[in-house]
Amino acid sequence: MKNRDFEKAVVLIPARMASTRLPGKPLADIGGRPMIVQVALRAREAGAERIVVAVDDEQVFAAVQNAGFDVMMTRGDHQSGSDRIFEALQKADPYGKAEYVINVQGDLPTIEAETIRASLRPMENAAVDIATLTVEITDEEEKTNPNVVKVVGSPLSETRLRALYFTRTTAPYGDGPLYHHIGLYTYRRAALETFVRLPPSPLELRERLEQLRALEAGMRIDAEIVRSVPLGVDTPHDLEKARKILAGRTL
């Protein structure tokens, strides 16, 4: 399935070697391929026509290049993935042909193609600067877990929220659904250019959530509601889960 909007988009996948819980994470073997290559394959399955991996390590660069994907070496001192993908964007698309920039985290080797495609849907509304994803929380423990970021949003439809806030606490108060934020973003190119030039904001620093910088600057973020949270690989246990998931499907 090809999404016509992918013709106007570039998928950028940041990869960093510096992981304290899982050293060498981008090169971890999953199904005979490095994890970062598995993520790029998921983007290809979603219908992406231009996929660029942004790396800070020669070994990762070589692994991605050998797999046939575009790869850009970036500086090692970036403070965030957004800064890294912006540097890669400037190198990969210097003439500004891409209207949308999809930031897929490099530790999501089992992400579903439909989940990636869903991040483009809010861009149908020209007022939206940034799109992201969310899932309704069904696990009671997640509702109070500060490691599960919640989207506080105003419903626009059964499948979309306008994000008003992101928080690690349990919110909003009262009866009704709570939503687990998925850190995959689609930016309008101009919005990404604006975002990376903004200084860290007070709420961003307080909650330790980069996306609050955009909201505090008056940018609009809409969140598409999807079916499930993709597995983020941060620990050896996560890595084993990812291996089992991909072993059960045809690659």
UniProtKB/Swiss-Prot annotation:
State the EC number(s): 2.7.7.38
Write the protein's name.
Answer: 3-deoxy-manno-octulosonate cytidylyltransferase
Q: Which residues cross the membrane?
A: none
State what this protein does: Activates KDO (a required 8-carbon sugar) for incorporation into bacterial lipopolysaccharide in Gram-negative bacteria.
**What organism does the record attribute this protein to?**
Agrobacterium fabrum (strain C58 / ATCC 33970)
What main location does UniProt list?
cytoplasm
Q: Which reaction does it catalyse?
A: 3-deoxy-alpha-D-manno-oct-2-ulosonate + CTP = CMP-3-deoxy-beta-D-manno-octulosonate + diphosphate
Q: Select a single GO molecular function from the record's annotations and give it.
A: 3-deoxy-manno-octulosonate cytidylyltransferase activity
Which pathway is recorded for this entry?
Nucleotide-sugar biosynthesis; CMP-3-deoxy-D-manno-octulosonate biosynthesis; CMP-3-deoxy-D-manno-octulosonate from 3-deoxy-D-manno-octulosonate and CTP: step 1/1; Bacterial outer membrane biogenesis; lipopolysaccharide biosynthesis
Spell out the InterPro entries in the cross-references. Cytidylyl_trans, KdsB, Nucleotide-diphossugar_trans
Q: Which GO terms describe its cellular component?
A: cytosol
Any one Gene Ontology BP term: lipopolysaccharide biosynthetic process
Top EC class for this record: transferase
| The keyword Phosphoprotein belongs to this UniProt entry's keyword annotation | no
Keywords for the protein's UniProt record, in alphabetical order: Cytoplasm, Lipopolysaccharide biosynthesis, Nucleotidyltransferase, Transferase
**Which NCBIfam families does the annotation name?**
kdsB, PRK05450.1-1, PRK05450.1-5
Q: Which family is this protein grouped under?
A: Belongs to the KdsB family.
For the keyword Nucleotide-binding, the answer is: no
Its localization reads:
Cytoplasm
